[in-house]
Design a protein with these regions (language model features):
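Mid-length scaffold segments of soluble, non-membrane domains
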Residues: 1, 133, 137-163
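Internal interaction segment
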Residues: 1-102, 210-235
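Short, surface-exposed coil-to-beta transition loops
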Residues: 7-8, 142-146, 189-194
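Short, solvent-exposed coil/turn segments at beta-strand boundaries
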Residues: 16-18, 124-130, 152-154, 170-179, ...
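Surface-exposed loop/turn elements that mediate protein-protein interactions on large endomembrane-trafficking
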Residues: 96-109, 146-160, 197-205
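Signature of short aromatic-glycine-proline-rich micro-motifs recurring in repeat-based ectodomains
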Residues: 108-120
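Exposed beta-strand-loop-beta-strand "reactive/processing" segments of non-cytosolic proteins
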Residues: 120-139
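Short aromatic loop motif centered on NTY/YTY
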Residues: 158-236
Length: 236
């Protein structure tokens, strides 16, 4: 949840002087370090070149000069996939064994017992390519998949995306293929990080990276999502 405008104003006002600040989330109440938060806000103002200007968060003033302009989101092309019917290569079948051998040759970082434990899913792409999905590693509370782009004859690996993602699919509205990874920082699930990529007709290309900050047992799913890379997806 986000702070309301009124809560944000109260927080910023409290940071301009010595204050005792507490946040209540459900039945949990946490103390916020006024000095630590004020230092973080001051650093934000400094980085954005807002110190001593009317738009500064904490150290406001009447100086008038240009502030740091936000960067333009990079545009990432994505291609809509018409045939979105997946197929399964079953354990023990000849085609399964052939594709598994190709995947192993292209990347040897997966756990053999896990790689051999499940069927391989094939996602159609465009330009006579497909995406293969196999289990790479399965831990106590999360798993990682092995993804690779192959030709539609399943004879050659053209791109490896191993150990980065654990979900694949198609966008419901625009039909482009994506891979997504979301991983817990530890078992409680109170801190996460992740990334996304989309098919642009040639390769899967990164579209986002994010994290939820530090690990705090009170926030299942993470306290908030903090993007470290964002983009504008343009579907063709």
């Amino acid at each position: 949840d986000k702070l309301t405008e009124e809560q944000t104003k109260a927080l910023l006002s409290g940071l301009k002087k010595e204050s005792e600040i507490r946040l209540t989330y459900g039945k949990t109440t946490l103390k916020v370090s006024d000095k630590g938060a004020a230092a973080a806000m001051l650093k934000m103002d400094e980085f954005q070149q807002r110190l001593n200007t009317p738009s500064a968060l904490t150290r406001q003033g009447q100086e008038k000069h240009a502030v740091l302009a936000p960067k333009v989101e990079p545009q990432i092309d994505a291609v809509s996939v018409k045939n979105r019917k997946t197929t399964e290569l079953k354990l023990g079948e000849k085609q399964y064994d052939n594709v598994l051998a190709l995947l192993r040759k292209a990347h040897d970082g997966c756990v053999d017992e896990d790689l051999e434990s499940q069927d391989i899913t094939i996602y159609p792409l465009t330009h006579n390519k497909v995406l293969a999905e196999a289990l790479c590693f399965k831990g106590a509370y999360q798993s990682t998949n092995y993804y690779a782009v192959l030709d539609d004859k399943l004879s050659k690996v053209e791109q490896v995306l191993a150990e980065q993602y654990n979900e694949a699919g198609y966008d419901e509205k625009q039909g482009y293929a994506f891979v997504r990874g979301s991983y817990k920082g530890h078992a409680f699930g109170d801190c996460w990080n992740g990334q996304d990529a989309v098919w642009n007709g040639k390769i899967f290309i990164r579209t986002s990276d994010w994290m939820t900050g530090g690990c705090y047992k009170w926030f299942t799913g993470g306290a908030w999502q903090l993007p470290t890379f964002v983009s504008d997806i343009i579907v063709k």
